[in-house]
Amino acid sequence: MEKLEGYSEKQKSRQQYFVYPLLFQEYIYAFAHDYGLKGSEPVEIFGCNNKKFSSLLVKRLIIRMYQQNFRINSVNHPNQDRLLDHSNHFYSEFYSQILSEGFAIVLEIPFSLGELSCPEEKEIPKFQNLQSIHSIFPFLEDKFLHLHYLSHIEIPYPIHFEILVQLLEYRIQDVPSLHLLRFFLNYYSNWNSLITSMKSIFLLKKENKRLFRFLYNSYVSEYEFFLLFLRKQSSCLRLISSGTFLERIHFSMKMEHFGVMYPGFFRKTLWFFMDPLMHYVRYQGKAILASKGTLLLKKKWKSYLVNFSQYFLSFWTQPQRIRLNQLTNSCFDFLGYRSSVPINTFLVRNQMLENFFLIDTRMKKFDTTAPATPLIGSLSKAQFCTGLGHPISKPIWTDLSDWDILDRFGRICRNLFHYHSGSSKKQTLYQLKYILRLSCARTLARKHKSTVRTFMQRLGSVFLEEFFTEEEQVFSLMFAKTTHFSFHGSHSERIWYLDIIRIDDLVNPLILN
C-alpha cells in the first residue's frame, strides 16, 4: 500500500492543468503541432462522412467566431447561436465537429505532457516494435499454449455521459474545461428529446471520432486499471489504444475506499490478480482474459468482474457479455484473425534394440487464419464484389486515370496481404486477391467501354505486378532455387510485421462487430 501511495503522489506532481483559453485563440494550431507533443506529423481530425478536418480549420473557425461575434451559448441572441440552431443542419453539424475535435486536441495535451515527463518513458522509443498490433500474436502464441480457459469480454458503453466527465475529474481539475466537455456531450444527448442514450453515443462516435476515442479510452482504462496495474509485469506489451491512459492518480484512495465498503469481497478476490498464469489482452471494446485455472475459477472471475464493475465503476455489465470457453475446443476472433489452439497428433517411431514402437504424441499449436466470410463481406460492403464473392466493377472510380485505378486496387490488395501475413492458410488471401484483381479489370473495362479480356492482354505483366505483394516477393527470394514451388496455398509460413500500428479500413469493421 505504501508503494501505491508513493506512486500516487508521484503522479500528482505530474498533473497538468488545462490551458482553457487556448481553445479560443488562434495559436491552437501551432500548439497542437508542437514537435515535442506530436512530432513532425500534422494533426488530422476525422469527421463524419469520411471528411478530414485539420487543426488549421479549427484555427480559421475560431478567428471567424471572433470576427462575426459567434457565441456558443447565447441567451440574449438565440438567432446567432448557429451551433445549436437545428434548423440549419450544415452549421450545426460542421461547427460542432470542428469545435469538439479541436477541444479533443487540447484535452490530449496534459496526457501527452505527463507521458513525456516520465523518466522511464524515455526508453520507450527504443521499443516501438512492441506498439505494433502484430506484436500481440507472438505474445498469445507464447502464452496460450500453456493455458486452459478463455474469457471473451465485451466492454459496455457508459450508461450516461456524466460518467465520462466524472472519470476525467481524477486527472482534470480545470472546472471550465469540464463544463465545456459537458456542453458538447449534452448537445448530442439533447439533439432530440426522444433520442436514447445509445443513439447519442453512436452519434458522438460517428461525428467526432477523436473526442469519442479519447473519452472511450479514458472510460475503458477505468474498467481495466485495477486489473492491469497489478498484472502489468506479466506482459511487456504496450497497447497504443490504451497505453496512454493506464496510470491513475487516486488509485490508492479508491482501493482503500473499496476495501472499507466491501472488505470481505475485496480480500477474497484480490489474490486472483496475483495468479502468474493470468493474461489479459484488449483492443478497443473487446478483451480476452485467459488462465490456466479450472472452470470454477473462471466462473468466479466472471462473477467478480460483473460485481466489480457494478460496485466500483457504477455501471452494469451484463453477464452474457463475458463468455467462457475452453481453449482447445473453440476458436476466437480478435484483431481480424480467427485464432485457435488445436491439439495435433503426431506418430513418433522409436527403436529399442530390435523392437520398434509407435508413440502417439499430442501437441498444442497456436493457429491464426484470415476469416473468409467476414472479409468477403467487408469487400462486398465496399462494393468490390457481391455478397457471394463475385467481383464487380467500381463505377465511382471510373473518372480516375488508369494508373490511379491500378494503384488503388493494388494498394488495397497489398494492405490486406500485409496485415494478414500471419495467417497460416493463404487460400483466403488469394481469393481476396482474385476478387480485387478482377474487380480492377472490370472497372477499367467499364471506363473504356471494352472487355476484360482486352485489358488483360494489353496490360499483361504490368497488371499482375501491381498485385504482386511484399509477402510473395519475400517467398520468391526464399524459394528461388525451388522449381516446383507455387504460391497458391502451398506454404503456411506466418510473418508478423512490427510496423503495423493501425488497422486497415476493410479489416476494422470485423473488429467492431
From Swiss-Prot:
Residues of the signal peptide: none
GO function term, MF aspect, one: RNA binding
Cellular compartments per GO CC: chloroplast
UniProt keyword terms in alphabetical order: Chloroplast, mRNA processing, Plastid, RNA-binding, tRNA processing
Subcellular location: Plastid, Chloroplast
Taxonomy, superkingdom: Eukaryota
InterPro entries reported in the protein's UniProt record: Domain_X, Maturase_MatK, Maturase_MatK_N
GO BP: mRNA processing; RNA splicing; tRNA processing
Function: Usually encoded in the trnK tRNA gene intron. Probably assists in splicing its own and other chloroplast group II introns.
Entry similarity comment: Belongs to the intron maturase 2 family. MatK subfamily.
Protein name according to UniProt: Maturase K
Lineage: Eukaryota, Viridiplantae, Streptophyta, Embryophyta, Tracheophyta
